[in-house]
């Protein structure tokens, strides 16, 4: 009984950690897909300003992220890339999202005293695609 009492909390913490990092990975996948959707819109020949950001934010909402409105989406439409002497113009869409662990951060606040422990972390995903107007 003593062994169970000592190992069960550790085993539960490891199990919860696996679920938490799985949730973080799933959130990062939604961010990556949102950046790709925004980049697909941004590289079109008749691009209208603001539509790439709107499309990425729409994907975040459809991905059912909590507080999807707190994500920031930025577009850099004129990134020049040189490969083997050839230059191509690309667009880069970057999505930043404040991710809050549900269990691990409150546990960390109990164990380690400090102002920065337990706050949200920023997950970042970006996508770069060649502009089709060339």
Residue ranges and their predicted role:
Residues 1, 14, 86-88, 120-122:
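Short, solvent-exposed coil/turn segments
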Residues 101-134:
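Low-complexity, S/T/G/P-rich flexible repeat/linker segments used as non-globular hinges
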Residues 1-60:
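Alpha-helical assembly-interface signal, strongest on the long, hydrophobic N-terminal helix that forms
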Residues 35, 95, 120-123:
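Short Pro/Gly-enriched coil loops immediately N-terminal to beta-strands
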Residues 37-98, 133-134:
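Short amphipathic secondary-structure patches
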């Amino acid at each position: 009984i003593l062994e169970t009492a000592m190992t069960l909390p550790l085993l539960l913490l490891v199990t919860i950690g696996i679920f938490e990092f799985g949730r973080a990975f799933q959130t990062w996948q939604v961010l990556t897909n949102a950046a790709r959707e925004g980049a697909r819109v941004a590289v079109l020949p008749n691009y209208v300003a603001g539509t790439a950001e709107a499309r990425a934010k729409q994907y975040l909402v459809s991905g059912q992220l909590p507080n999807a409105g707190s994500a920031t989406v930025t577009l850099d439409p004129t990134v020049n890339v040189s490969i083997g002497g050839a230059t191509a113009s690309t667009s880069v869409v970057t999505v930043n999202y404040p991710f809050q662990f549900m269990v691990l951060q409150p546990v960390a606040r109990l164990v380690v005293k400090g102002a920065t422990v337990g706050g949200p972390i920023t997950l970042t995903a970006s996508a770069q695609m060649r502009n089709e107007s060339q």
